[in-house]
Amino acid sequence: MLFLGPHACEEALVRGELHSLWIAPAAWGRVARLVADARNAGVVLRREPMEALDRKAQGQRHQGVLGEGGAFAYAAIEDLEASLRARGDAALFLALDGVTDPHNLGAILRSAAGAGVDGVILPERRSAAVNETVIRASAGTAGRVPVCRVVNLGRALDGLKEAGAWIYGLAAGEGSRSYLDEPFDRPTVLVLGAEGEGLHLKIRERCDGLLHIPMPGGIESLNVSAAAAVALFRVLARRGPHGA
């Protein structure tokens, strides 16, 4: 996996995922701390011309710094269930049903990391995987939150429900109530669907309740990454300083 830009490389180094670091001469002085930390960690350092980094990144922005490492380390669903039991009513998870755009996924993971989410669940099918584009879009923060890929999202939600979670689907329409009215005072899983399609029926049926974000301006909906950020930080606001 490639880590594009200094922030993504710093995060990968902290997680122990960085194997080699390519730095263009013009960027060397700007990342002296990263170079020192990487050298201390035994990471292979390579001073390469900008053209070499451009070829390696295949047109993606890298700011003169590019890292190589292993595949993204996904969490197991059992780890998330254990975290739920340990955190009790403060537990907060995010499940994504059919979010295929890597830029949206990266933005969502950045918000999830900022909100201190206990885990993000993705289906293996009909979903973007965590790759270089996602890590770049997350500003390098994708590894700060446990991300789990599952064969069957519905079964994963069933397992979290059995462990004590309350499943909320973010969806407008009949039977949905405003998220402003929900106290979020129990272990919570927020489920968001793809833009345009929304939640699939089998996922919708597994939800304990449906919530929507009011739109007084008259637009139909928010971008899925914006909706995720709004919903996550609403949960934190409702719980107060001791509920996160």
Residue positions per predicted region:
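RNA substrate-binding interface of SAM-dependent RNA methyltransferases
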Residues: 7-11, 17, 23, 33, ...
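N-terminal positively charged helical leader segments and presequences
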Residues: 1-86
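Active-site/ligand-binding-proximal alpha/beta "capping" segment
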Residues: 168-223
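Short, hinge-like loop/turn segments at secondary-structure boundaries
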Residues: 39, 63-66, 136-141, 185-188
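Short, glycine/polar-rich helix-capping loops at beta-to-alpha or helix-loop-helix junctions
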Residues: 30, 127-133, 197-206
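Short, acidic/turn-prone active-site loops that include or flank metal/cofactor-
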Residues: 26-28, 50-51, 125-127, 195-197, ...
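Structured adenosyl-cofactor binding patch, chiefly the S-adenosyl-L-methionine
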Residues: 114, 119, 136-141, 201-244
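Short glycine/serine/threonine-rich phosphate/pyrophosphate-binding segments
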Residues: 103-107, 199, 224
